[in-house]
Amino acid sequence: MSRLLAPAFAVLALATLAAGGACRREPASPTDGPPLIRLEPLAGEAELLGDGYLTKRRAIRAPVPSTLSWPIRVPAGGRLETHLSFARPLRAAAARLACRVRVGVGEPGASEPATVVDRRMEPHGPWEAYLADLDPWRDQEVQLSLSVDCSSGEGKRTWSDGVRWSVPVISRPRRSGVVNVLLLTVDTLRADHLSAYGYPRRTSPNIDGLARRGLLFRQAETPQSATWPALTSLHTSLYPSAHGVVWNGHDMPGAAVTLAGLLHARHYSTSAFLSNMKRARHPGFARLTGARAGTQAGDDLEATEAAIDQLRMEQDRPFFLWLHLIGPHAGYNAPAPWATAFVPPGASEVRGELDELVRIRQAGRSLTERDVAHVVGLYDGEVGWVDELVGRVLDALRELDLQGSTLVVFSADHGEDLYEHNQYFFHSPSMYRSSLEVPLIMALPGVLPEGGETDQPASLVDLAPTILSLTGLPVPSSFQGHDLLPGGALPAATDARPLFSETNGRIYGVRADGWRFVFNPEDYTPGAPGGAYPIERVELYDLSRDPREQRNVAAEHPKRVEALTAEITAWRDRDLRPDVPSQEIDPETLEELRALGYVFE
């Protein structure tokens, strides 16, 4: 089946663009949604290009002045969307320039197309949307053109690298039966600090409401207690030592098969809004926006508002939108009123800032019970703040009448040690349930049970295959995760499969049959904020008697240790790569990771 419908070409004024173009259309099916036409360049793939403000889109470079044009057949109800950003040289000369941007529609070969958008402006950086109703030309063969030219007091000006046009998309009204995907993830969020999971404090009324409308997984874990490895596993359905991102700052391979890439290939709009992990590569997203407010609370608010703005644009096509909030990540400094909402009475000098917690640990100072309770209250305030933001997104989904057609998946990259192990307030490189357990809630009206709960073991590597299955799309054989809901329903019997985890490709863990086993074959002592984080060669915990994992009973159960060691060895041989090539981390990313406590000397 050919996806090439018609040739296209570029018409240039005073410049030559080395690209042709093509209309590419996917076949329609009940789960595919409306046919989308993407106007792709033929000479090489479009690039993921930024606007200088941390938002990236799949885009085409064009000189100034220039006109890009494509012959297309306009579908009924056709709607054009593209975005324009000016390159840095034009922005630098903005005060002396006046630019004109036009979108035109006309008969193929016509010299003067009808102008449907005509804007005059100074060059600026942030992407600006260009939307046009093409329905007046329904079922007609037309030529769509995108033009830009700039002039100063000296006349017309030229630049070889002038603007970026996001790959234009023409959509038509949504068909019934299409499943959108809204993925909400929160950094450093413990499942057991959500009231939906039985926490006595009412930290999460909005997340609780989502659980009442959906299915809650009580035994969900991350494959690694670090953000970049965990979220890469979520999107690739591979364990960290299989995809290669074994530590923060390591980049996802460009050829990785990702959830976003697979949905984008089936003409989903794909966008991501990130408070954390902003500098990581995320193949498959047509739009990638990193918040830049400068504070965790500000970044979260900015990312949330941008995500809601994007939802308002997603009325006519299937979408995959990912929002990742940093909220509960140390330091624990939620805005009012959440900053003090759960702090118990009684003074404590501990403020919950990351650098302060690091200094306390470096000094070997033990905190009092009051100090720990105070810090936990600050952490819970962060949970309350993030819950408020999640509520705003869910409210927008309902107000836009998208709730009934959208699969909502809520989870976290990892949890947080709250002084349970090694006198530690952080997560990486913890191998314990405090940092490995994550919330997992899925809601899809009419498909998933409302108010349901399950003890079915689940890992972040299972999310991509489960999401694809619920949208009716095939699951790649390369995925290592499982479809948690085959046919949209829980398996008749609870799956007792083990949940595996690792840290830095050197320490391994498994949760199986009510036990947690940690295997450190190299006697490796990982570093952590404030000092070393010692982990014994073998650790075994009976979760039924010791849910907080405080007593290592490996010496009392040698046969259990032997069996679980064999389980981990088989998993490593089957699913993990023996050698992960080291990767260089650029200075900007390194500094950002250091500020978050991910890099420590």
Could you say what each language-model-derived stretch is?
Residues 1-6:
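Positively charged n-region of N-terminal signal peptides that target proteins for export
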Residues 7-18:
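Bacterial N-terminal signal peptides
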Residues 21-94, 100-105, 109-601:
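Catalytic domains that recognize anionic headgroups
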